[in-house]
From Swiss-Prot:
Disulfide bond residue pairs: none
This protein's GO CC annotations: EMC complex; endoplasmic reticulum
Name by which UniProt lists this protein: ER membrane protein complex subunit 6
Topology, Cytoplasmic side: 1-23, 70-87
Length: 108
């Protein structure tokens, strides 16, 4: 095995992938809650709130890929597209809606 393959195997080891997913989940959880609070404070309603979430959620994921993964998410995740964009989507939209209604109730 060449040294490049050994390095890739170490980076893509199960423990490292789990740690990377935890860090990504923290970023996504924090972002979803902040986006929900801001949407509530701005009194965004209905479909506009969900569009707000979808656009900014994807933008934050792209920033994560560019800044943290340095445009090489395959080095850090076994299935980058699924792991970054889809795996925790319903978890994040639930947190967003919770924070959105809380922020909306505080202002309204």
């Amino acid at each position: 095995m060449s040294s490049n393959e050994e390095v890739f195997t170490q980076i893509n080891a199960t423990a490292n992938v789990v740690d990377n997913k935890k860090r990504l989940l923290f970023v996504q959880d924090s972002s979803a809650l902040v986006l929900g609070l801001v949407a509530g404070f701005l009194q965004i309603e209905s479909v506009h709130g969900f569009i707000w979430f979808l656009i900014l959620y994807n933008l934050i994921n792209v920033i994560y890929i560019v800044w943290i993964c340095q445009l090489q998410p395959g080095k850090f995740y076994q299935s980058p597209l699924h792991d970054i964009f889809f795996e925790s989507f319903f978890r994040e939209i639930t947190g967003f809606v919770m924070a959105w209604t809380f922020g909306y109730a505080l202002i309204g």
